[in-house]
């Protein structure tokens, strides 16, 4: 897992997300504590449990983006789920145990890819040999291994010449016919509610039935090389060891991000049974507190999995969650609404800002977009004003405003090829004046 310091994590998040330092610090400390726990003596390590985080803030301020970026930094099994997709056991929908099963799948995939990377050089050599065996068949009476080791001498020289050409990419477009493992057919089984685990076992059992089939395929050498490297690497990886390490990794380092947690909170004044909502909360309790979940790879304990929940809490309040679940999220972080300065920073300072994206898109047609500082400031003001007058959808408002602003240029891009379009305050006002002044903005709301 990642050994980045909290300062390094926050610095990396700053490249993509503006403001929200409290939330960034909280997730950075939580991520660093995962690493710290691994350095503690084994007798005490088991007693140190993660402190789960609840992020509270309006939509479009960076809650989900923090989760997305954290997934790339964590170098640990990470899964993001929507709380609204789950229902109480017995109702139609996914049960919460599937969160852990999906996390284990991520861990297995991650571990397998890491192991395949380690044996990649050996796999590439084996793949090269298989391609060379097709290009230069062994001499009659000689085995494949004999040809590969260079006896007789003539074959060895030819193989060396072709190997050099192969590595230099001179043969990439040449077509060859090669034997490859055929993908096993996937069996789709409709699962009743609460029986996902049994369905997974049945699917696994059916997929293992029968012998591995191979068939000859005609491919360009470049494509064949990729497929052969994957096949050879898979042979060199110990699947049982992968499963064992993946289970341990999911248990000790796993991170689960639960989005839209407020949507399963029941408002006190609201009537109705709300069985499904409260049921999801009750089902989440043992998962967050620590329980054992059965997966197709084995049993997984959730005691040391870190849970980060987030929600806008527009209609409900954090106190509307059942008390037991509130207690499972001791760290609470409030994210603030975005200001005009934040909008400016989003447009100019982030690593892949909307300005850079639109410039790159139109550059493909020979149109140069030049945003002046005054133009960006005016754009930020308009986005902020529209948010204040209508629904506040945070940074997502910038996408609406930018699309409206550049609608004309995007449409006429082929005609404007070779020209430079300067987006200054006047340009912005000319196209968005009605948007910033008209009180009836309903048709511009996302």
UniProtKB/Swiss-Prot annotation:
It is found in: Cytoplasm. It comes from the Bacteria. One of its GO terms (cellular component) is HslUV protease complex. GO terms for biological process: protein unfolding; proteolysis involved in protein catabolic process. Pfam families: AAA, AAA_2. Keywords: ATP-binding, Chaperone, Cytoplasm, Nucleotide-binding, Stress response. ATP binds at residues 18, 60-65, 259, 324, 396. One of its GO terms (molecular function) is ATP hydrolysis activity. A double ring-shaped homohexamer of HslV is capped on each side by a ring-shaped HslU homohexamer. The assembly of the HslU/HslV complex is dependent on binding of ATP. Belongs to the ClpX chaperone family. HslU subfamily. ATPase subunit of a proteasome-like degradation complex; this subunit has chaperone activity. The binding of ATP and its subsequent hydrolysis by HslU are essential for unfolding of protein substrates subsequently hydrolyzed by HslV. HslU recognizes the N-terminal part of its protein substrates and unfolds these before they are guided to HslV for hydrolysis. This is ATP-dependent protease ATPase subunit HslU.
């Amino acid at each position: 897992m990642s050994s980045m310091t909290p300062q390094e994590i926050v610095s990396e998040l700053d490249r993509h997300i503006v403001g929200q330092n409290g939330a960034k610090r909280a997730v950075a400390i939580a991520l660093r504590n995962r690493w710290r726990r691994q350095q503690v003596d084994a007798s005490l390590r088991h007693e140190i449990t993660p402190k789960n985080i609840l992020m509270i803030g309006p939509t479009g301020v960076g809650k989900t983006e923090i989760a997305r970026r954290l997934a790339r930094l964590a170098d640990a099994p990470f899964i993001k789920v929507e709380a609204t997709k789950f229902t109480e056991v017995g109702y139609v929908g996914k049960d919460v145990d599937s969160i852990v099963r999906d996390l284990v799948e991520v861990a297995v995939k991650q571990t397998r890819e890491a192991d395949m990377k380690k044996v990649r050089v050996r796999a590439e050599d084996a793949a090269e040999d298989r391609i060379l065996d097709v290009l230069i068949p062994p001499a009659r009476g000689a085995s494949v291994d004999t040809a590969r080791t260079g006896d007789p001498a003539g074959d060895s020289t030819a193989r060396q010449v072709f190997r050099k050409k192969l590595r230099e990419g001179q043969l990439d477009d040449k077509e060859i016919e090669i034997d490859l493992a055929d993908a096993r057919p996937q069996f789709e089984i409709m699962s009743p509610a609460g029986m996902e685990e049994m369905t997974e076992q049945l699917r696994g059992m059916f997929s293992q039935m029968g012998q591995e089939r191979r068939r000859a395929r005609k491919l360009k050498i470049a494509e064949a090389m990729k497929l052969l490297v994957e096949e050879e690497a898979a042979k060199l990886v110990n699947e049982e060891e992968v499963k064992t390490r993946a289970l341990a990794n999911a248990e000790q380092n796993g991170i689960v991000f639960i989005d839209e947690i407020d949507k399963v909170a029941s408002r006190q004044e609201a009537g109705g049974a709300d069985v499904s909502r409260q049921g999801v909360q009750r089902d989440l309790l043992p998962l967050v507190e620590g329980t054992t979940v059965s997966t197709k790879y084995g049993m997984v304990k959730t005691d040391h999995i870190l849970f980060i929940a987030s929600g806008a809490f527009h209609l409900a309040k954090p106190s509307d969650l059942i008390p037991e679940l509130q207690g499972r999220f001791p760290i609470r972080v409030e994210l603030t609404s975005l200001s005009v300065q934040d909008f400016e920073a989003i447009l100019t300072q982030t690593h892949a800002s909307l300005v850079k994206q639109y410039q790159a898109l139109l550059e493909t047609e020979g149109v140069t977009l030049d945003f002046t500082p005054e133009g960006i400031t005016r754009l930020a003001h308009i986005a902020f004003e529209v948010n204040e007058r209508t629904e506040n959808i945070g940074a997502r408002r910038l996408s609406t405003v930018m699309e409206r602003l550049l609608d004309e240029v995007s449409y006429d891009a082929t005609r404007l090829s070779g020209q430079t379009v300067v987006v200054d305050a006047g340009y912005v006002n000319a196209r968005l004046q009605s948007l910033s002044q008209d009180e009836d903005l309903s048709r511009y709301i996302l």
